[in-house]
Amino acid sequence: MRVLFVYKEKNGDNLFVPVIRTRLSVHGIEAISSVDEFWNPSRSYDIIHIHWPEEVVGWNVNDVDIDKRLETRLRYFKEKGSRVYYTCHNLSPHYGSPLHQACYRVVERMADCMVHLGNYSLGKMAGLYPDCRHVLIPHPIYLGAYDDTLTREAAREYWGIDRRTFVVTAFGKFRRRDEVWMTLKAFFSLPRRKKLLLAPRMLPGSYPKPLLSVIRCLLHLLGVRTENNERIISDEDLPYYFAVSDVVFIQRCVILNSGVVPMAFLFG
């Protein structure tokens, strides 16, 4: 069996797809990650698996006919005998682009099988697309993807954090203003005298650099270490954020799931 994950693997990106691809390979399934292979295939595939429609069409797409092109391409694969799988990470794109919205609907409509990470999307999407097969598969815990043997002491030495400091980490990218306010309110309400919030991707990247610097400095005085939300966290640094933490705070308000939850379990 040959599976195409329509996804471009990049350093510092979410390892969700690479982890699954590696595990499939262990079981003798040929699994490939590529966006180019979707638009210009060099071979046939038994399964075309889409995780994020934005990965397929581009995160900054401006082609008004992109949804039609996407449907044509999916129809091409289905006519060749491929089955279309879709993992429902989000019900809608994070930033609400009408072009991306249209592509989400195309993928949902064309999917032969929809994989859900939780019961909420399964119940909702099964009602909307009853002819599609719907399965629930829990989020993987990234086993083997990172060094999970780090001690808290080693991580604190790495970040230069005193062992008596209570550390809260809000790791994921902040996409909404209410996520920022919820996190800061929770942190400042914490009844600890010596505390630190690590939120490496909290500040909007659209802010001018001088303003970002001022905000970052002010927050630092209040015990918050943060950067802009476009920052890429290296695979080498990632384990240290979790190993150093007393609490991993999940700042999601409306998003279906967060990979930070299983990642936190990986690091204990």
Locate predicted features.
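Conserved donor-binding/catalytic core segment of Leloir-type glycosyltransferases
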Residues: 161-178, 187, 197
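An anion/phosphate-binding loop that grips the pyrophosphate of nucleotide cofactors and donors
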Residues: 45, 111, 245
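Donor nucleotide-sugar binding/catalytic pocket of nucleotide-sugar-dependent glycosyltransferases
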Residues: 112-126, 130-147
